Design a protein with these regions (language model features):
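Arg/Lys-rich, positively charged N-terminal/basic patches that mediate binding to nucleic acids
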Residues: 1-34
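Solvent-exposed interaction patches of small proteins and small membrane subunits
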Residues: 30-32, 52-55, 89-95
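Generic structural signal for secondary-structure transition and capping sites
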Residues: 27, 42, 46-49, 89
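Structural signal for well-ordered, non-membrane alpha-helices
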Residues: 16-19, 38-45
Length: 97
């Protein structure tokens, strides 16, 4: 059985900012980005240990077609999505929670 995905408030903020940015760039691009994020959540949920570590217990998964990674931590009963990070930003932000 797959663990549930929980999304931190910071990750939700990251997601909304990215969707808003892409919607300004091109109509419908924000929806495409959100679809790719949801696909990546599904991959994380199915195989949480398949991704590489960024720091201690934090793993990351690359989002297809966009310059983003999702950082997460596999906990006992759930998978916590920590950040949805634009890879063009400061690398130190990856470790913020």
């Amino acid at each position: 059985m797959h663990k549930i995905i929980s999304i931190t408030p910071r990750a939700l903020e990251d997601l909304q900012q990215a969707i808003d940015h892409y919607n300004v760039q091109l109509q419908g691009l924000g929806i495409r980005f959100e679809d790719n994020i949801n696909d990546t959540f599904g991959k994380i949920q199915k195989m949480p240990k398949a991704a590489s570590f960024t720091h201690d217990t934090v793993r990351y998964k690359v989002v297809q077609d966009f310059p983003f990674i999702i950082t997460y931590e596999e906990l006992e009963t759930r998978i916590a999505i920590l950040r949805i990070f634009n890879t063009h930003q400061d690398d130190e932000k990856i470790f913020e929670r």
